[in-house]
Amino acid sequence: KPIWICWLDGIENAPLLVQKCVSSIKKNAANHPVNIITQDNYAEFVTLPEYIIEKKEKGLMGAAHFSDVLRVCLLAQYGGLWLDATIYCKGKIPEDYFENDFFTCKSEPSDVGCISRNQWTTFCLGGTKDCILFQILRNFFFEYWKNEDFAIDYLFFDDIIEVARECVPEINHLIEAVSYNNLERDCLIQRF
C-alpha cells in the first residue's frame, strides 16, 4: 500500500525542514512506495473536477484546501497512508498502520480546543480504498467546492469528519476502532 505526501511546489523547492521530514518518511517506509504529489504530477494519480482546478488557479482555493481534496481523492481511489510533508519519522512506520480499514493518529480524548478532541488527525490518515470515510469526504469536498468560492474555516476538514462521525454510525465505528498511538507526537508543543 502506498504512502502519499504532498508538496505542491516539489520537494526540491521545499524548505530544508520539509526535505528532512520527507527523507525520514522515505527511510522508514519499509516496502511501501512513497509518492510525492506535486502541482505538476497530481493529474497522473487522480482526476479532479474542472471547477476545483479553476478555483485553485484563480486563488479561490488555497494550497492547504487543494491538498485536502487531493488527500481524500488519493485515499478513496488507492488507499494507503497520507502523511503531511512536515511529519518526521524517527523509526520504521508500523505495518499495522496499513492493515486496517482506517488509521489515524489518536490519543486519549481531551478538550484541546479542536473538534477532533485527539480522536483523529488530518495530517496522518490511512486505510483501504473502499473506506466509507474517504468516499464521503471526497464527495463532500466536490459538492462544497462546486457551490462555494472560499473555505468557511481553515480546519473545516475536521468539521466534516465530525459531522460524518455523528451521522454515519460506520464512520464512528471506524474512528472508535483505532487504538491510541503516537502518544508523544505533540510533545514539542509543550516546550514552546
What are these regions (language model features)?
Residues 1-67, 85-192:
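Glycosyltransferase-associated regions of secretory-pathway enzymes
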Residues 78, 83-85:
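Active-site acidic Asp-centered loop
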Residues 69-78:
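Small-residue hinge/turn detector
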